[in-house]
Amino acid sequence: MAQHEVSMPPKYDHRAVEAGRYEWWLKGKFFEATGDPNKRPFTIVIPPPNVTGKLHLGHAWDTTLQDIITRMKRMQGYDVLWLPGMDHAGIATQAKVEEKLRQQGLSRYDLGREKFLEETWKWKEEYAGHIRSQWAKLGLGLDYTRERFTLDEGLSKAVREVFVSLYRKGLIYRGEYIINWDPVTKTALSDIEVVYKEVKGALYHLRYPLADGSGCIEVATTRPETMLGDTAVAVHPDDERYKHLIGKMVKLPIVGREIPIIADEYVDMEFGSGAVKITPAHDPNDFEIGNRHNLPRILVMNEDGTMNENAMQYQGLDRFECRKQIVRDLQEQGVLFKIEEHVHSVGHSERSGAVVEPYLSTQWFVKMKPLAEAAIKLQQTDEKVQFVPDRFEKTYLHWLENIRDWCISRQLWWGHRIPAWYHKETGEIYVDHEPPKDIENWEQDPDVLDTWFSSALWPFSTMGWPDTESPDYKRYYPTDVLVTGYDIIFFWVSRMIFQGLEFTGKRPFKDVLIHGLVRDAQGRKMSKSLGNGVDPMDVIDQYGADALRYFLATGSSPGQDLRFSTEKVEATWNFANKIWNASRFALMNMGGMTYEELDLSGEKTVADHWILTRLNETIETVTKLAEKYEFGEVGRTLYNFIWDDLCDWYIEMAKLPLYGADEAAKKTTRSVLAYVLDNTMRLLHPFMPFITEEIWQNLPHEGESITVAPWPQVRPELSNEEAAEEMRLLVDIIRAVRSVRAEVNTPPSKPIALYIKVKDEQVRAALMKNRAYLERFCNPSELLIDTNVPAPDKAMTAVVTGAELIMPLEGLINIEEEIKRLEKELDKWNKEVERVEKKLANEGFLAKAPAHVVEEERRKRQDYIEKREAVKARLAELKR
């Protein structure tokens, strides 16, 4: 390779570093899956963001984790497919488009279904572009040649196939059920679209008279308007207060209808009066009770939240207006005898803000029990889906074991239209992939499918299924890992698993990596109402994508929430700045070296041996931790290696040979520096792709881009444990001298005498060999290294492993203060010895811990005892 010019500006500017780089990667096709038969495939499908607008910090976190995994796998030689795509997001998108129309004084009905859908597709195209530009700013290595959308023709085909197949197996049916109903958007809502808020309401206590005139029974409700649809009063079968009333009738006030008193174990005897009114058409629990007792279902509301003909004189009133009126009427009749304040959790529509109405409706459902059973069974086999952290498997199984049928129809226009037609004359239902031949005699179901129905097929529908011969399906399915938040385990993860098992016979992914929610610095959930949301694009503008990504990836452990803090992102920017400055210094001192000239065979300094040993340890640790998705630990490991070992120590020590006259030593140090920087950039690349590519392109390197450079390998022949030990001793000594200087306020520029009392000849020889470093970094006016050195009274001391440091500082120290300091240090070593001896006396620890761990504890004990004895001896001298 030709000599490389260094083109790194003196100052790190994230905007300049990140500008244009993503387009360069795309042009190079580095992110496209190759289908290379000599490589093992590795697949992730992106959780498709809603096409409705901006990505938030949760998306940035989720996609950064996926990018780290896929970049690392690509470097490890896998044929990586990271498939991008977006979700049509039924109600969310329709609500946005309807809002836009409202501003023009129009409704969707003014446009008609076809024109409205045209408008929605336009909206989709515009917002899909926004999302792609945000993915680009984050630096995500997505294969855009395979981008999918949940309403694509291919995915629509998969949706029809699944619907028809489940219908024919009797697993999809049409029936009445209580659903979450939004009276403003006039559609069913999934549980995730309902936001619960604490609301100050009232509990109304009513007396229903017994039909035979022998008394009355007390019930309480928060929704008195629903009493018009009551069809029973329920009590617990074991409740002695009411046993004699079971089977009797009560007369429903206002309505005059007679309804039975029934016994059901669902009733809580301790709550209120122990008797509850049952309205099967307006409450999910009452609906279940109604089914058990064969009660009629009387719906008293219209779809828009007004009262219907069953509400008699209240017909046409809004439900809340009706509540006020009915309360007045019940008070007049003496039925309502108490109103008490009551704070309770009320469901609101996430889209319209309306209070959600539990509402009896004819909808399409998936029969869940048989599908859930297969998913539960899978978790008892070796092929189970691995949850990381594994505690989330319990959450997942608990939901599957207590599953209810899934309402899949939505009263919307935007989405997958249900492939069912009703005969205009006979009412016969026809379900198939294509419309009936005599279409003029049939009317298609106007509803669309729940968005989650198509999302559940995402891992295989995106690969060409139902065409099981599709090359992508055969090569890249099942996928390897799904990265997602714990808040959608039920809505999405579980549904993908049971649909994957039902239609492909395979789990859709091997691992599910769960992350938490992004919270603000005070630990509060980010929300519009609190105004504490943060736009990731603003953070990128201020600090760069690399800083944001590194913070997001390393800021918490799997499954935990993440607290966003600008200070921490700024600290990460400082880390990037440190890397930039260190790399630039190294490159300025490479002397135009080429990749071919890189030679690690020359004679190395102790610092060279040490940094190569530390690099090997770091490669091994980072690789192992990343395989377990412990990215927080990876971050700490890389940070410590880069900031402390590489920048603060090695680069400083490398200045000795780099600025010296020995050309051979210079060449070796340059080679070590280039090799270590190259490997460090590769380790850091999945986290900080932009800055690492920029630096790597300036380093002597081989290959087109760091994105496809091989992942670093441990090279045992470059490790030298003996030299690393020597270096650790040097670092300990230099740190201790700096610490003492700080204590007595003596600047590093002022020379001081330094006596080093070593424990044996071996340590003395090692320090003598590396004396140049001690002279460079400790600035001694006099340097003595021996097994026996003078110990003047007025001296500061420090103890390190294998040596005691004595610094005669006549006139600079206070003997009393030094004794106090040493007594504190003695206390510290006493505690350490006690702690380690307690551990070594523990039978359980000795029996369970690996031999090398026990050996390490014994080594620590010996080290702490030696340090303690040295401090004791020094104290004795000072007190004489």
Curated annotation (Swiss-Prot):
Top-rank taxon, per record: Bacteria
Main location per the UniProt record: cytoplasm
Keywords: Aminoacyl-tRNA synthetase, ATP-binding, Coiled coil, Cytoplasm, Ligase, Nucleotide-binding, Protein biosynthesis
UniProt subcellular location: Cytoplasm
Disulfide bonds: none
Coiled-coil positions: 809-880
UniProt-annotated binding residues for ATP: K528
Gene3D superfamilies: HUPs, Isoleucyl-tRNA Synthetase, Domain 1, Valyl-tRNA synthetase, C-terminal domain, Valyl/Leucyl/Isoleucyl-tRNA synthetase, editing domain
Record remark on domains: ValRS has two distinct active sites: one for aminoacylation and one for editing. The misactivated threonine is translocated from the active site to the editing site.
Listed HAMAP family: Val_tRNA_synth_type1 (MF_02004)
Name assigned to this protein: Valine--tRNA ligase
Source organism: Geobacillus kaustophilus (strain HTA426)
